[in-house]
């Protein structure tokens, strides 16, 4: 019996082994046990069984002992157990692929029999291997794989061990069976080392990787009639991995991979040509399979419902196509720099011993080698929305390629020898869908054409797809040995929790697809495509990590190049192969940490963050906002702007620049073939990478400052969110590629086409005819409306090219041409400390760039090749808001004025009451000063008693008309912005400066003052100084009588005119409006005067109510007004005055809420309309932002054209804008301005556009680099700035003008930037809004400075020179203008000696005036000190 069984074993095992004899078999029949020793297996048979790739061959397989145990009575439910003690496998790599694998001996042994009992028993076998050692030998390295305690067993579809009958699913309708297996092991050790060839690269480091528990899950689908495998699914699952890689090990890994790449590529071509036939028989689409199953199941549904349920169960776990998967639950990779022996100088700037940690969570690699190109991917592992997006995009690309092929067949009229007569799968799908959004160009070729000219069998087109997914990742910044032990910050991470990313969404999703025909590798196929999706990634710009990473990668690259040279490997990177790429990104952030400094640390932001809510980048025309129609409209917009024309040489552009609008943009916009024409018998060529046109579209991008401690970490907006589109191409590379093709082509047979010729011709080719073809082309681009005009333009261009030749060196084409456009209004907001942070960031980026260049040059051993770029930026409008510190005159001058007893202080405006209620009384200017003393004392007592019970209601008193007396129309206009800018200070106690306490706020000077101490001390101080205030008013009234009488008479002259103008602007009825009273807010319109004042109240504390404002009564009831004090937060006053051509647009302040979050009344904007009030439910952490006053200056421009040119180290920036307007909002709250609650913050098109502009209003040109030395020697290093203002009529308040200097002042000694500023036909009106020093001042009078042509130059020594541009005029006109000058101007033409004598005569007079001025100043200071001493007797804490 034993002998018979041994013969049967020999019969079957002889196909797998060598030299197997009966004496090597020890068999116990009854026990069901057997043992074999010293087995040598057949290598070729194992290759066929394992289906190894053809670049790998088995040379030896040995097993020392094998034992088997069979449970004869339980074969249906329990597996046969096969135990192997030690298995050794030796393999080698093949430079040329070996012959493909033959048919599996298992299928041969079955004799094409059906899947029966014997096959079930053999397939359910349980295998145990104590150790497996696999050695692989290559010409460059040798590697070994060692596995311990390996087990292989059958499992159910849920990958659990169970009864053998549950480990397979058989569907008799399909004639297929599914089986599931799992392989596990305890330890896997991988080691690789370089081959010792003596004279070759001696520096090698062994590469080691040890993993703990892992498993492989295998699902097989066979045909039951012959046991052949139709498809398989293999999943390689690894648990947590920790891998430390040094740079030398990483070099070794790259070398090994590179040595195998060539052989693997050849093997891949061989595999594609021999795609498995069983897969071809499988129905291509899941829908077809489902319908097939439903057809079989439907016919038997009534008779056998269990068969239908079995089919559904089979469908649930069906393996629709072969695939391979690798899943790593967590990978901690530590990359270390262990290179200590390097050439001197290379590692001088390198962090020695640096290390970087990379952590990847749920990292997956999926490979689908035989996917039908038109098939759905819903059955793929972890199918997600990203796969659907890529599938739709890839389908459009394949349909575009198919349309080109069909068009070529129609044009040639030839039936190809490889035609299979099968219509396109894509075409059938598209026609069945009949999408109305489909491009007509994609539909038309298939309609009405003859069946004789059909493309190849598109339904046989295959694709091999690789999917890479990373659910979460953290890449940390580089750490060094001397660094503190704390964990370094992240360099790149995913913010899953912040953006609430669903579990099926990966942080990184990558799909790479290649196409092939298994029947014929020579058939043209679509270009491979790459799809990438990024979600929630945050990158932190760390210069140290970037420098370390740059040197690390350069070292790897240099080592790899040396390795290629040693082994004479091909460099595949030099091929100009096109790859269709699309990148989708959502919620991206790039953080730029800002330098920390101790000075003003609380005000400095910690980081500048670039955010993008959505981004699409692609080099195809099949993506949202990246289509041909989008490019056409963009190109028309740029062509309509004369600034971007190549023949435009007006300032700020100069002749000789790059031609931005290259014709390559036009080729892509209208889908014109730019490749050289091919003979008709050859199919169209694939596009080259040099012809790529990249488009990047941002849905919303913004820049924000984060981490400002003074604002409790609030994010402050720098650039408001706006959409942005970028289009870029490589015209120089494209033209060089076309020129190489022409050199290779026959000149007689190959004539340049119009599509190739027109981009090549340029001004540089034909300088004598610079205005002919190209300029004419760009002129006609303004009216582009379709393909017909474009073809005419190209014909014109080609005619000029034919005469010059295509190989002439082009000088007006850069390496990169880029168009940047946004249809939205761009807003920029900046304060002083943010400005300083940007300056420091610029220095950091400059140092980083310089260091990267030095490191790269030192590692490569050669200087970097000069790169050129041409960038055009086009915005419809933009604004820059400068958030300056309130001017001292706008905050503190009132107190100074009131202390100096001047009632003319602030033109006696009711909104100028700034100090305590005593000072508020002194600030008013009624007709009768004596009467005001009597009334103020009465009103002061009445109000102090009634206010605590009135809940903040206003007392309507005070003569508005007489308070504004004495200045006339121009004076009132010049005050409007000042009155507005001072209201914020009056609405909070920020102007007072008591000692510091626990709770602080920001006052007008940016200093910290306590809030609680303010309330307590002011409430007591008010009661103490109530009587003292009356005495101080009596003492100062004599000094103000004359000023009051003067202002009264002057005001009466202009009152009627101002009143009527105000009524027209505000649409006010002439009658007095009643005062509206509410619990939450009070609006008190005042009529009958030249201005309109509005009050807004809020709920108050008891301490705030104790120092309310003083109501001043006067003779006329219609002129009564209530004035609030400086210490009260109850009311915000808004003065709405005449809006004339010279007035400054006034702003308004929203109501200020208390900590309880009380909703305020609707805000009234500067148009007299109600607008939503500020959100008053502000947390205490945002309190500083609410009360923080800033002086806002907004610069607005229209039609912004921006050009950047880079030529190696030379950088040129040119900017042009059509109109410049200034908007001065005065002093407003920072929080309400950032939230757009100030009138005037919304952009509006100017209603006074100047249509007669010959030149743009603003022109700016900045040059830096060696080429800028033509302007001055210092310009090559620091740059040269040239600014031109033409036809600008600007108005500036003196407070804003004085604030610009400190705003732009750097904290470090700035470098001298040579510059030239030209003012052409412009005027500047200065309006003084700072209170006068003396009470006798008649008030500020606006000063207008008109300039016909003034030039301000700054030389290298920092000296400014002011002069006129006399060179622009003929010499005769200059002489005539000098003769027409008045005699007083001719003092500059007097000889030097006479000038000296005249100065000597005037010297005594000047000295006398100087002495008198000093004496007057000393007297004024004494008077001021006396008054201060008198006031401090009653209020010790009073300060100016």
From Swiss-Prot:
Compositionally biased region (Basic and acidic residues): 911-920
Keyword Membrane tagged: no
Function noted in UniProt: Tube-forming lipid transport protein which probably mediates the transfer of lipids between membranes at organelle contact sites. May be involved in the retrograde traffic of vesicle clusters in the endocytic pathway to the Golgi complex.
Residue numbers carrying Phosphoserine: 444, 446, 755, 758, 988, 1103, 1106
Compositionally skewed regions (Low complexity) per UniProt: 287-307, 985-995, 1134-1150
Disordered: region residues: 267-307, 430-456, 751-780, 891-1008, 1106-1180
GO molecular function, one term: histone deacetylase binding
Subunit architecture: Homodimer (Potential). Interacts with UHRF1.
Coiled-coil intervals, chain numbering: 837-860, 1401-1435
Keywords: Coiled coil, Endosome, Phosphoprotein
Annotated organism of origin: Homo sapiens
Cited Pfam families: BLTP3A_B
Protein name (Swiss-Prot/TrEMBL): Bridge-like lipid transfer protein family member 3A
Subcellular location: Late endosome
Occurrences of domain Chorein N-terminal (ranges): 3-95
Biased composition (Polar residues): 1151-1180
GO cellular component: late endosome
InterPro entries in the cross-refs: BLTP3A/B
């Amino acid at each position: 019996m034993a002998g018979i069984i041994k013969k049967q074993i020999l019969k079957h095992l002889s196909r797998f082994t060598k030299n197997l004899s009966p004496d090597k078999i020890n068999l116990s029949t009854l026990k069901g046990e057997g043992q074999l020793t010293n087995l040598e297996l057949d290598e070729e048979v194992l290759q066929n069984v394992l289906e190894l790739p053809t670049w790998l061959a088995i040379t030896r397989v040995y097993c020392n002992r094998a034992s088997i145990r069979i449970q004869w009575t339980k074969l249906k439910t329990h597996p046969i157990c096969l135990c192997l003690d030690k298995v050794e496998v030796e393999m080698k790599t093949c430079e040329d692929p070996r012959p493909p694998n033959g048919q599996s001996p298992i299928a041969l042994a079955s004799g094409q029999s059906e899947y029966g009992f014997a096959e079930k028993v053999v397939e359910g076998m349980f295998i145990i291997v104590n150790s497996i050692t696999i050695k692989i030998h290559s010409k460059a390295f040798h590697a070994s794989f060692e596995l311990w305690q390996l087990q292989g067993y059958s499992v159910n579809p849920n990958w659990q061990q169970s009864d053998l009958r549950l480990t397979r699913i058989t569907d008799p309708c399909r004639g297929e069976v599914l089986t599931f297996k799992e392989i596990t092991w305890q330890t896997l050790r991988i080691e690789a080392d370089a081959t010792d060839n003596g004279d070759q690269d001696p520096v090698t480091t062994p590469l080691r990787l040890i993993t703990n528990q892992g498993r492989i899950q295998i699902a097989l689908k066979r045909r039951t009639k012959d046991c052949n495998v139709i498809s398989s699914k293999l999943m390689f699952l690894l648990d947590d991995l920790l891998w430390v890689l040094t740079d030398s090990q990483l070099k070794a890994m790259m070398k090994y991979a590179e040595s195998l790449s060539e052989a693997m590529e050849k093997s891949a071509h061989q595999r594609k040509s021999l795609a498995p036939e069983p897969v071809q028989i499988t129905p291509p689409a899941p829908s077809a399979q489902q319908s097939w199953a439903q057809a079989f199941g439907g016919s038997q549904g009534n008779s056998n419902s269990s068969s239908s349920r079995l089919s559904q169960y089979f469908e649930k776990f069906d393996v629709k196509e072969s695939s391979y998967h690798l899943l790593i639950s967590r990978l901690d990779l530590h990359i270390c720099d262990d290179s200590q022996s390097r050439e001197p100088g290379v590692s001088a700037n390198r962090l020695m011993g640096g290390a970087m940690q990379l952590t990847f969570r749920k990292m997956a690699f999926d490979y689908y080698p035989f996917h039908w190109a038109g098939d759905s991917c819903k059955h793929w592992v972890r199918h997600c929305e990203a796969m659907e997006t890529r599938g739709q995009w890839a389908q459009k690309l394949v349909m575009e390629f198919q349309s080109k092929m069909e068009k070529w067949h129609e044009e040639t009229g030839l039936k190809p020898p490889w035609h299979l007569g099968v219509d396109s799968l894509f075409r059938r799908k598209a026609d069945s869908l009949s999408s109305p959004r489909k491009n007509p160009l994609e539909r038309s070729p298939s309609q009405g054409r003859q069946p004789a000219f059909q493309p190849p069998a598109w339904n046989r087109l295959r694709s091999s797809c690789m999917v890479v997914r990373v659910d979460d990742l953290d890449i940390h910044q580089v750490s060094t040995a001397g660094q503190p032990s704390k964990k370094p910050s992240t360099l790149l991470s995913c913010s899953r929790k912040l953006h609430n990313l669903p579990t099926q969404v990966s942080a990184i999703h990558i799909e790479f697809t290649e196409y092939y025909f298994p029947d014929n590798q020579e058939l043209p196929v679509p270009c491979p495509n790459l799809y990438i999706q990024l979600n929630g990634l945050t990158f932190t710009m760390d210069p140290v990590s970037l420098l370390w990473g740059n040197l690390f990668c350069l070292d790897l690259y240099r080592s790899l190049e040396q390795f290629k040279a040693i082994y004479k490997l091909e460099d595949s990177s030099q091929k100009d192969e096109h790859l269709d790429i699309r990148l989708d990104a959502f919620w991206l952030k790039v953080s730029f940490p800002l330098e920390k400094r101790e000075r003003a640390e609380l005000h400095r932001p910690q980081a500048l963050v670039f955010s993008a809510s959505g981004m699409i980048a692609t080099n195809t025309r099949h993506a949202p906002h990246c289509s041909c129609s989008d490019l056409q409209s963009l190109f028309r917009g740029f062509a309509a702007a004369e600034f971007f024309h190549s023949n435009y040489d007006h300032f700020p552009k100069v002749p000789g620049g790059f031609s931005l609008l290259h014709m390559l943009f036009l080729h892509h916009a209208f889908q014109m073939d730019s490749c050289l024409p091919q003979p008709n018998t050859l199919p169209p060529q694939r596009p080259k990478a040099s012809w790529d046109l990249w488009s990047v579209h941002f849905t919303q991008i913004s820049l924000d400052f984060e981490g400002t401690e003074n604002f409790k970490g609030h994010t402050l907006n720098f650039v408001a969110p706006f959409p942005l589109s970028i289009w870029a191409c490589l015209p120089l590379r494209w033209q060089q590629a076309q020129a190489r093709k022409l050199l290779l082509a026959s000149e007689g047979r190959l004539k340049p086409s119009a599509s190739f010729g027109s981009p090549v011709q340029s001004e540089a080719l034909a300088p004598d005819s610079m205005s002919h073809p190209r300029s004419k082309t760009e002129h006609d681009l303004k009216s582009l409306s379709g393909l017909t005009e474009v073809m005419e333009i190209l014909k014109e261009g080609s005619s000029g090219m034919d005469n010059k030749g295509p190989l002439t060196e082009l000088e007006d084409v850069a390496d990169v041409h880029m168009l940047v456009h946004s249809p939205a209004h761009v807003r920029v907001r900046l304060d002083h400390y943010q400005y300083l942070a940007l300056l420091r960031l610029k220095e950091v980026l400059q140092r980083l760039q310089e260091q990267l260049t030095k490191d790269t040059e030192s590692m490569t051993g050669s200087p970097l090749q000069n790169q050129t770029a041409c960038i055009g930026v086009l915005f419809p409008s933009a604004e820059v808001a400068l958030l300056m510190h309130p001017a001292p005159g706008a905050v503190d001058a009132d107190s100074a004025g009131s202390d100096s007893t001047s009632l003319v202080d602030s033109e006696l405006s009711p909104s100028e009451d700034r100090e305590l209620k005593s000072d508020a009384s002194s600030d008013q200017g009624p007709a009768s000063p004596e009467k005001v003393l009597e009334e103020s004392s009465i009103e002061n007592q009445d109000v102090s008693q009634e206010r605590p019970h009135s809940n903040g209601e206003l007392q309507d008193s005070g003569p508005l008309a007489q308070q504004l007396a004495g200045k006339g129309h121009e004076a009132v206009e010049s005050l409007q912005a000042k009155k507005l800018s001072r209201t914020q200070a009056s609405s909070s106690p920020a102007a007072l400066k008591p000692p510091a306490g626990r709770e602080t706020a920001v006052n007008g000077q940016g200093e910290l003052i306590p809030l609680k101490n303010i309330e307590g001390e002011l409430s007591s101080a008010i009661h103490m100084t109530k009587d003292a205030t009356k005495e101080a008013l009596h003492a100062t009234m004599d000094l103000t009588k004359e000023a009051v009488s003067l202002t009264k008479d002057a005001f009466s002259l202009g009152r009627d005119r101002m009143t009527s103008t105000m009524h027209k602007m505000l649409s006010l009825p002439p009658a007095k409006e009643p005062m509206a009273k509410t619990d939450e807010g009070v609006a008190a319109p005042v009529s009958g005067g030249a201005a309109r004042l509005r009050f807004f109240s809020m709920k108050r504390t008891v301490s705030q109510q104790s120092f309310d404002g003083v109501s001043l009564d006067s003779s006329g009831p219609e002129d009564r007004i209530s004035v609030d004090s400086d210490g009260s937060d109850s009311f915000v006053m808004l003065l709405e005055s005449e809006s004339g051509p010279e007035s400054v647009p006034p702003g308004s302040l929203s109501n200020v809420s208390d900590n309880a979050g009380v909703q305020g009344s609707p805000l009234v904007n500067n148009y007299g309309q109600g607008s939503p009030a500020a959100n008053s439910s502000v947390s205490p952490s945002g309190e500083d932002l609410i009360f923080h006053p800033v002086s806002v200056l907004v610069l607005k421009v229209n039609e912004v054209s921006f050009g950047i040119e880079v030529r190696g180290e030379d950088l040129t920036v040119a900017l042009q804008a059509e109109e410049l307007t200034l908007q001065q909002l005065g002093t407003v709250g920072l929080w309400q301005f950032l939230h757009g609650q100030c009138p005037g913050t919304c952009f509006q098109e100017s209603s006074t556009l100047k249509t007669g502009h010959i030149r743009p209003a603003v022109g700016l040109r900045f040059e830096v680099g060696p080429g800028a030395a033509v302007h001055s020697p210092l310009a090559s290093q620091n740059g040269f700035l040239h600014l031109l203002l033409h036809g600008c009529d600007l108005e500036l308040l003196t407070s804003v003008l004085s604030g610009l200097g400190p705003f732009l002042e750097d904290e470090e000694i700035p470098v001298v930037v040579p510059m030239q500023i030209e003012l052409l036909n412009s005027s500047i009106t200065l309006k003084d809004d700072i209170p006068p020093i003396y009470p006798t001042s008649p008030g500020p009078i606006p000063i207008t400075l008109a300039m016909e042509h003034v030039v301000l130059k700054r030389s290298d020594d920092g000296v400014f020179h002011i002069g006129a541009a006399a060179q622009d005029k003929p010499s005769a006109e200059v002489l005539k203008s000098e003769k027409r000058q008045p005699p007083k101007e001719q003092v500059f033409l007097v000889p030097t000696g006479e000038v000296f004598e005249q100065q000597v005569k005037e010297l005594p007079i000047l000295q006398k005036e100087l002495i008198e001025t000093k004496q007057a100043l000393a007297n004024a200071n004494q008077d001021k000190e006396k008054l201060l001493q008198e006031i401090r007797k009653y209020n010790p804490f009073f300060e100016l």
